[in-house]
A protein has these predicted regions:
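Feature primarily recognizes SF3-like P-loop helicase cores of small DNA viruses
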Residues: 1-50, 77-385
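Trp- and S/T/G-rich repeat-edge/linker motifs of beta-rich repeat architectures
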Residues: 53-56, 60-75
Length: 385
């Protein structure tokens, strides 16, 4: 969302100064006054656990870029004092910028996983009722279409039947996206695996549109689990999903990967800010032609892999370069209903549907094939080939 109009509305609500209210204020007093005006126009600010300042749009909480926040604070002070020269002084702006996150700091509240936020309201998944948007749900996203419980997605299902005919594996995909909207701890990363022209990139394009581009991050395994991974991991904050296409990921830290896959608290660091701990961050989908190389042969590493093989090669004569665009333009509400069915199934089963294709692919990744597989199956961890 372009939050600049929202910030402009707050500035416009600041009353013009008079002789009686134009006294010099401390940074804390200015920040407090700005927050009170923001609350009055229903756009309150709050600093979340990731140390970013957010503002409520009326539908969800949006993160304010540091530079834009500085401009806003300068403009707000200039409006309060009718003195833009003083409001533009570096030490004044920096003082407000440092103070403001503390003024609007609130209790760390996680997003409500029993509800999903749509353009036309919030669906309570327990009661199946569509409710009005509330700031107290602390959503940091809104899905970019209305909730429609009767919507269908025939074009999407036809595509899925063509590229991934196995019904159990289709269920796994729906359940994984549905998992985003649950508090379940399932400890999985989804890997879409296979060589080109097999439809997996179309699936990723559709899922990104389904969740909203602004709710997606694009961090690679090697970046998140590498030497400076704390900066890369900071970009997962407030996102629903992280997607990335690594052609051939190099060996990476298995320990950090396991923490991310498990949804455990992870350390992050934004540039020029203190280390923060994330507890609510994106789920993972990686679209790969080759599976990651690893020195970690433990069960704890491999059990976090959910590998969906895309093995159907689509002939050039059948390739429709605009297929994802066609599906996205008409079927997102219906696809979300497919996801909600997967979510319900996931909760009922307390886990993902068993897919023989996924299991076979995981075994091949872990143990290899042929003679190598037979040998690895009898070797203990730490001695596998």
């Amino acid at each position: 969302m372009d939050y600049k109009k929202l910030l402009g509305d707050i500035i416009n609500a600041i009353p013009q100064p008079t002789a009686s209210n134009n006294k010099r204020r401390t940074s804390a007093e200015v920040c407090y006054k700005i927050q009170q005006i923001a609350i009055k126009v229903s756009h309150p600010f709050q600093t979340f656990r990731d140390q970013r300042v957010y503002s409520y749009t009326g539908k969800y909480w949006v993160s304010i870029d540091d530079f834009d926040l500085k401009i806003f604070l300068r403009e707000a002070l200039g409006r309060m004092t009718n003195n833009m020269v003083e409001a533009s002084q570096r030490e004044v702006v920096e003082g407000l910028f440092k103070q403001f996150p503390y003024t609007v700091m609130g209790l760390a509240v996680e997003q409500n996983k029993e509800k999903i936020n749509f353009l036309n309201g919030t669906i309570d998944l327990k009661t199946e009722r569509l409710e009005q948007h509330l700031y107290s749900d602390y959503f940091r996203y809104v899905l970019p279409y209305p909730y429609n419980p009767s919507a269908m997605c025939p074009m999407f299902m036809k595509y899925l039947d063509r590229v991934l005919p196995d019904k159990d594996t289709q269920k796994v995909l729906a359940e994984y996206i549905g998992w985003i909207f649950t508090p379940l701890k399932l400890e999985k990363c989804l890997f879409l695996y296979g060589s080109g022209k097999n439809g997996k990139s179309v699936f990723v394009d559709i899922v990104e549109a389904l969740l909203g581009k602004e709710n997606i991050s694009h961090e690679s395994l090697s970046d998140m689990c590498g030497e400076n991974g704390d900066r890369s991991r900071a970009n997962l904050s407030g996102k629903l999903l992280n997607t990335c296409s690594d052609v051939a990921p190099n060996a990476f830290s298995g320990d950090i990967f396991k923490r991310i896959a498990s949804g455990e608290p992870i350390s992050t660091r934004q540039l020029y800010k203190d280390v923060a701990t994330l507890t609510d961050y994106a789920k993972m989908i990686f679209c790969l032609n080759e599976l990651p190389k690893t020195n970690d042969k433990s069960n704890g590493y491999f059990r976090r892999f959910l590998i969906v093989p895309f093995k159907v090669q689509i002939p050039k004569s059948e390739v429709d370069p605009k297929l994802a665009e066609k599906i996205i333009s008409t079927e997102l509400p219906g696809i979300m209903n497919w996801v909600l069915e997967g979510r319900e199934r996931l909760i009922t089963q307390s886990g993902f549907t068993e897919s023989s294709l996924c299991q076979k692919q995981l075994e091949e990744y872990r143990y290899g094939s042929g003679v190598r597989k037979k040998v690895n199956l009898i070797l203990p961890d730490g001695f596998k080939l």
